Amino acid sequence: MGSLSIWHWIVVLAVVLLLFGRGKISDLMGDVAKGIKSFKKGLAEDDEPAKTPAAPPEAPRPLPHQTSSAAEAEKKPV
């Protein structure tokens, strides 16, 4: 009772064909195919820039730092 038999699927298919008709279903499938094709094309375009080597990153520059006695001298005004 919980599973769908072949007759259930035939009735569902007949209702879908009556509601949408042959032309609308083929148009819908064409739109889905175009979407998949453009998605694959976008993925291929994203891969192309990754193949070209990028400029090496800049070496990090050390931050200037002070010794603790020099830092405390700046905090306390004379």
From Swiss-Prot:
InterPro entries: TatA/B/E, TatA/E. It comes from the Bacteria. One of its GO terms (cellular component) is TAT protein transport complex. Signal peptide: none annotated. Residues 54-63 have a biased composition (Pro residues). Residues 43-78 are annotated as: Disordered. It is found in: Cell inner membrane. GO terms for biological process: protein transport by the Tat complex. It is a single-pass membrane protein. Keywords: Cell inner membrane, Cell membrane, Membrane, Protein transport, Translocation, Transmembrane, Transmembrane helix, Transport. One of its GO terms (molecular function) is protein transmembrane transporter activity. The chain crosses the membrane at residues 1-21. The keyword Signal does not apply. HAMAP family: TatA_E. Part of the twin-arginine translocation (Tat) system that transports large folded proteins containing a characteristic twin-arginine motif in their signal peptide across membranes. TatA could form the protein-conducting channel of the Tat system. The Tat system comprises two distinct complexes: a TatABC complex, containing multiple copies of TatA, TatB and TatC subunits, and a separate TatA complex, containing only TatA subunits. Substrates initially bind to the TatABC complex, which probably triggers association of the separate TatA complex to form the active translocon. Belongs to the TatA/E family. PANTHER family: SEC-INDEPENDENT PROTEIN TRANSLOCASE PROTEIN TATA. NCBIfam families: PRK00720.1, tatAE. This is Sec-independent protein translocase protein TatA. It comes from Xanthobacter autotrophicus (strain ATCC BAA-1158 / Py2). The gene is tatA.
